[in-house]
């Protein structure tokens, strides 16, 4: 009985931290999307993790990658935050995003916590069938 009580206690102690993390994660993604909306790729690049920054080297290469590989995040329409789940290096935030043509896309943002802030360490385009009812 004690192990179950201990696990329950850990869950309830972690829940408030998780809730705050969820808000911070969503704020980070929202700020990056706002920067894309304003064509401020230097600012958008600042929300990427150091590993992503080292891959692209700077905002210009990052801009090219976003426009070619993830056009739906550049000047998006409506954005809806879906589930956020832990994964082995941090958290994964699923979102629904509409592009300029009003087509829905589903993305998973992989987030890592560095110090007291969250950074985007990757984005995966998900099949829409993963979210059908």
Which stretches of residues belong to each language-model region?
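Positively charged n-region of N-terminal signal peptides that target proteins for export
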Residues: 1-5
């Amino acid at each position: 009985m004690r192990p179950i009580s201990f696990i329950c206690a850990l869950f309830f102690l972690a829940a408030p931290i998780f809730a705050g993390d969820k808000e911070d994660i969503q704020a980070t993604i929202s700020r990056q999307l706002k920067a894309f909306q304003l064509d401020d790729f230097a600012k958008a690049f600042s929300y990427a993790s150091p590993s992503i920054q080292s891959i692209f080297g700077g905002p210009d290469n990052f801009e090219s990658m976003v426009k070619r590989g993830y056009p739906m995040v550049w000047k998006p329409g409506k954005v809806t935050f879906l589930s956020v789940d832990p994964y082995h290096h941090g958290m994964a935030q699923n979102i629904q995003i509409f592009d300029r043509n009003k087509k829905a896309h589903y993305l998973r943002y992989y987030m890592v916590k560095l110090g007291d802030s969250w950074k985007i360490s990757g984005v995966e385009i998900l099949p829409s069938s993963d979210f059908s009812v």
